[in-house]
Curated annotation (Swiss-Prot):
The keyword Flavoprotein does not apply. PROSITE patterns: WRKY. It is found in: Nucleus. GO terms for biological process: defense response. Induction: Induced by infection with the root-knot nematode (RKN) Meloidogyne incognita and potato aphids. Residues 273-339 bind DNA. This is WRKY transcription factor 72B. It comes from the Eukaryota. The keyword Kinase does not apply. The lineage of its organism: Eukaryota, Viridiplantae, Streptophyta, Embryophyta, Tracheophyta. Residues 1-100, 131-159, 234-267, 356-381, 427-454 are annotated as: Disordered. InterPro entries: WRKY_dom, WRKY_dom_sf, WRKY_plant. GO terms for cellular component: nucleus. GO terms for molecular function: DNA-binding transcription factor activity; sequence-specific DNA binding.
Length: 489
């Protein structure tokens, strides 16, 4: 009842009095204000508000009640909206990045497709090239097999139906070319041969009379032989001119030009060489070898690789009696331009082969017996060293012989049963006098080379200067016909 009465009579003065009492109490209890200040200094929760209520003041004791009320949810909605906005921005940026990545993937896919297409094209081209190379190798293998078989059979058969010339081919020579050759003979008669440098111009040419003449006495002296050659040269030219006119009138010029290439012959070169092959200036590739009878050294077979379809072949074999001697046998006709380093040997062998084929074509025997052995076999070869090389241009039906002279030579004869072969023996070391050199130079003037490889700036003659310093002429011409011999040691 008392409390109710107090509440009923509670006036503004009483309120002021209560406030003063509170301040006094706070001063008395220092902690009270300090705690209140601390409470004020502490951040209140955003969702609550603090209220202080003082109930009673009894005997200096103060009961302070603090009430907290939850604030309205406006601030929470603002925070959630900002969070949703950030998430939307992140989602949009992620979508943009995914779109860029997809576009990049599309570009990479197109680039990969283009690369794959180019790769397939290159692969197809590679397969085509490999297929072509395989076809070429198979065709070349077939040609090599047939060529090897042909070369093996040619060692046992006597066939004269294939041409031999290691210079430029004369199989397509026309009528004008024949007249040019005859004109060159007259030009060489008027020109002198220079002997200042120690080089040997090696050129051979032969002319034959179709009508038989009486056999003149054989004289091996250099003076008589050279005089006979010079005296008979004009007669030979007149006879050749008459024959050429006859061929033109009868239309047989092409037939004659095509008959000589159908002959078959070989040129064998004997040199002292330590290398497996002789350096003749051409490029060769080995395609086989075999052991021949009577010689323990293998015989190697080579083909010319200067041109893809060149038919020239050569055989290389050591001499059975002297292993330091290398025997190289050439066969075939070059169908390409010769390198400068190969013209010397080619012109030399071409002149020898032309002489051999010309001699066989003027023989009355359509199938003469021929020989193809070297002069090193003592059982089948006989030689007589004389002071000169004698060319016996014979008519086998009437046994007519016309001797021609070359200095420092020998005559050889060998057994038959092989192809006609002319041998160049470069292994002789016999000495020669200055007169022999002059006679040889005169003969090279009388018999010029058929193919001229010389020009004003360079010399491609066959040079034996290292041998000439020792006063020797190591050249051998051997035509192994039974009655025709061209030999020089």
């Amino acid at each position: 009842m008392e409390n109710k009465n107090k509440a009923e009579y509670y006036s503004p003065d009483d309120e002021d009095r209560d406030i003063d009492n509170q301040e006094n109490i706070i001063h008395q209890f220092g902690k009270g204000r300090k705690e209140r200040e601390d409470d004020k200094s502490k951040p209140s929760s955003p969702h609550h508000k603090d209220y202080m209520n003082i109930d009673n003041i009894e005997g200096g004791a103060v009961n302070v009640m603090v009430k907290r009320e939850r604030s309205p949810p406006e601030h929470n909605s603002m925070a959630s909206s900002s969070t949703h906005k950030e998430q939307d921005d992140q989602l949009a940026s992620a979508k943009d990045e995914m779109r860029e990545v997809m576009e990049e993937n599309q570009r990479l896919r197109m680039h990969l497709d283009r690369m794959m297409k180019e790769y397939r094209n290159l692969q197809n081209q590679f397969h085509d090239i490999v297929q072509k190379e395989t076809d070429q190798k198979s065709s070349s293998t077939t040609v090599n097999t047939s060529t090897t078989h042909h070369d093996h059979e040619s060692d046992q058969e006597a066939d004269q139906l294939v041409s031999l010339s290691l210079g430029r081919t004369t199989s397509d020579m026309k009528k004008d070319d024949l007249s040019k050759i005859l004109k060159k003979d007259k030009v060489h008669d008027d020109e002198g041969v220079s002997n200042n440098n120690k080089s040997l111009d090696l050129g051979l040419d032969c002319k034959f009379e179709t009508t038989p003449t009486e056999c003149s006495p054989v004289n091996y002296s250099p003076e008589n032989s050279l005089d006979d050659i010079q005296a008979n040269k004009d007669e030979n030219e007149e006879t050749s001119n008459k024959n050429l006119k006859t061929m033109r009138n009868n239309g047989d010029g092409d037939d004659v030009s095509q008959q000589n290439p159908t002959k078959r012959a070989r040129v064998s070169v004997r040199v002292r060489c330590d290398a497996p092959t002789m350096n003749d200036g051409c490029q060769w590739r080995k395609y086989g070898q075999k052991i021949a009878k009577g010689n323990p050294c293998p015989r190697a077979y080579y083909r010319c690789t200067v041109a893809p379809n060149c038919p020239v072949r050569k055989q290389v074999q050591r001499c059975a009696e002297d292993m330091s001697i290398l025997i190289t046998t050439y066969e075939g006709t070059h169908n390409h331009t010769l390198p400068l380093s190969a013209t010397a040997m080619a012109s030399t062998t071409s002149a020898a082969a032309s002489m051999l084929l010309s001699g066989s074509s003027n023989s009355s025997d359509p199938n003469p017996q021929v020989t193809a052995t070297t002069t090193t076999t003592p059982t089948t070869t006989t030689s007589a060293n004389i002071n000169g090389l004698n060319f016996y241009l014979s008519d086998t039906s009437k046994h007519h012989k016309s001797p021609y002279y070359f200095p420092n030579s020998s005559i050889s004869a060998s057994a038959p049963n092989s192809l006609p072969t002319i041998t160049l023996d470069l292994t002789s070391t016999s000495s020669s006098s200055p007169s022999s050199l002059s006679h040889l130079n005169r003969m090279t003037q009388n018999f010029p080379p058929r193919y001229n490889y010389n020009n004003n700036n360079s010399t491609t003659n066959l040079n034996f200067s290292s041998v000439l310093e020792s006063n020797s002429l190591p050249i051998s011409w051997t035509n192994n016909y039974p009655n025709q011999t061209y030999n020089k040691k």
